[in-house]
């Protein structure tokens, strides 16, 4: 299983003092050198952490894969086509939220989704949708022309009772299997950490996990290299 590192909260820390450090681009380079298969950043409409210049510099420096998380807006579509990350991930976005709170509402947005996706894919950029692990959402993602679905693991990360955890893993596994059978690649993310990641090793359809807050929190104390290698050990060797 591969690991994509979300470096948004490096920018959050930098912006807390309106300084130049820590630098998300430097953090991304260390993550790549430590074994990360990709770098994820979310250019939010309010620019609360990653800024436009960060995205430009990341595009110039990332050597693995750059995944731009973004809202489904004309502005973000233009930015994506101009900067050409390897991949965009469409996510829901609310200004008042601390972090993304749920999967992309593909049912409500379906009528304009295929039209939005086509010029992005025509520019040579793959498209992923951050969705709830439900068969209907998977089917609509495939029909709209997505390449990848990212299973929203937030609800799983909040479960405490073993039976609830098992039920959520089963739900994710079923959706992931359906997605792969539908011709989609499957990744997973949101709320995953060093303590709840192990069950995902048993879901063979999931090729990559995307981890941000937990990994950056460990990096703040132990360093980015250690944080990345510790996670890679858990998902591949434990």
From Swiss-Prot:
Keywords: Cytoplasm, Pyridoxine biosynthesis, Transferase. Pfam families: PdxJ. GO terms for cellular component: cytosol. It comes from the Bacteria. The keyword Cytoplasm applies. Homooctamer; tetramer of dimers. Belongs to the PNP synthase family. PANTHER family: PYRIDOXINE 5'-PHOSPHATE SYNTHASE. This is Pyridoxine 5'-phosphate synthase. The gene is pdxJ.
